[in-house]
């Protein structure tokens, strides 16, 4: 098989055909950049973080499939992934993940040295998350740290430091990630129970829907506190109100715990993150 034949396989391994993960990683990064820069992040920083988000999410997907290669064949949604079907070798996957990570590192070299230092725990979080499903009862919380680490890095890039408000925003992202990834885990719960991996959907059990809604409430409450501390105005809080309405819509989708509606709720979180960002950006622009 030629390289041109293999490129589509690598694209699938990187989830280039499924941008939802990159968007869920990008929105909190943009929240941080806008807040840190008072609504005017430097263009080069914005470009670097946007490209870096896609690269690191792609690297994380490759590592995830490497870690889960012996499980994915037993799960309906993942059984046709390239590593599960052996269409791509583990050696190829590791080389691809290393290359993507290296490109991400090169991207941030022009930024503040603190960003470079923070990139090391960010890489560790991205690489280790897939393995937490073997040990942690709620690996989605770990995912929230990994997916939200662009927040302290964004503040470091703009301000040269990471103020307390950035860590509160990261905490909000953790609760948001537990909410949306529990919806995702509800899709795979029957298969995950069979193969013995741990997810929040399994841990929460019959309280899964209530836990998801509580996490949404805490996440939005923390983002409200962040906005108040930063002196944001009505448009920011209008964005949070729209996001809250979307969370209530998710309740109507997940309350019966059916696979397709739960997956729809997960994917719809892109718009929830976008609503928060739109409120923040508009508040700086015309508020």
Swiss-Prot record:
Q: What is its EC number?
A: 2.5.1.39
Subcellular compartments: Cell inner membrane
| Pathway assigned to this chain's UniProt record | Cofactor biosynthesis; ubiquinone biosynthesis
**Catalysed reaction(s)?**
all-trans-octaprenyl diphosphate + 4-hydroxybenzoate = 4-hydroxy-3-(all-trans-octaprenyl)benzoate + diphosphate
* Any one biological process term the GO annotation gives: ubiquinone biosynthetic process
PROSITE patterns, per database record: UBIA (PS00943)
Biological role? Catalyzes the prenylation of para-hydroxybenzoate (PHB) with an all-trans polyprenyl group. Mediates the second step in the final reaction sequence of ubiquinone-8 (UQ-8) biosynthesis, which is the condensation of the polyisoprenoid side chain with PHB, generating the first membrane-bound Q intermediate 3-octaprenyl-4-hydroxybenzoate.
Q: Which PANTHER family match?
A: 4-HYDROXYBENZOATE POLYPRENYLTRANSFERASE, MITOCHONDRIAL, PRENYLTRANSFERASES
What is the protein named? 4-hydroxybenzoate octaprenyltransferase
Organism encoding this protein:
Azoarcus sp. (strain BH72)
């Amino acid at each position: 098989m030629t390289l041109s034949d293999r490129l589509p396989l690598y694209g699938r391994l990187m989830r280039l055909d499924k941008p939802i993960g990159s968007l869920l990683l990008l929105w909190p990064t943009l929240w941080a950049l806008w807040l840190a820069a008072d609504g005017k992040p430097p263009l080069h920083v914005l470009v670097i973080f946007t490209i870096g988000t896609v690269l690191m999410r792609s690297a994380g997907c490759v590592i995830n499939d490497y870690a889960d290669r012996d499980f994915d064949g037993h799960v309906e949604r993942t059984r046709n992934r390239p590593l599960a079907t052996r269409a791509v070798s583990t050696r190829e996957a590791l080389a691809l993940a290393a290359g993507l990570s290296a490109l991400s590192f090169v991207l941030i070299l022009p930024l503040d040295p603190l960003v470079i230092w923070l990139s090391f725990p960010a890489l560790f979080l991205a690489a280790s998350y897939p393995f937490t499903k073997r040990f942690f009862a709620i690996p989605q919380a770990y995912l929230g740290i990994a997916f939200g680490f662009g927040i302290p890095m964004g503040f470091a890039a703009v301000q040269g430091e990471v103020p307390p408000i950035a860590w509160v925003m990261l905490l909000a992202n953790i609760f948001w990630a537990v909410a949306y990834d529990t919806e995702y885990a509800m899709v795979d719960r029957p298969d995950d129970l069979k193969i013995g991996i741990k997810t929040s959907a399994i841990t929460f059990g019959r309280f899964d829907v209530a836990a998801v809604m509580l996490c949404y409430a805490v996440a939005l409450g923390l983002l409200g506190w962040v906005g108040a501390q930063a002196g944001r105005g009505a448009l920011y809080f209008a964005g949070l109100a729209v996001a809250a309405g979307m969370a209530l819509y998710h309740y109507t989708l997940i309350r019966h715990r059916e696979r397709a509606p739960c997956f729809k709720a997960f994917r719809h979180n892109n718009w929830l993150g976008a609503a928060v960002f739109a409120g923040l950006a508009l508040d700086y622009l015309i508020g």
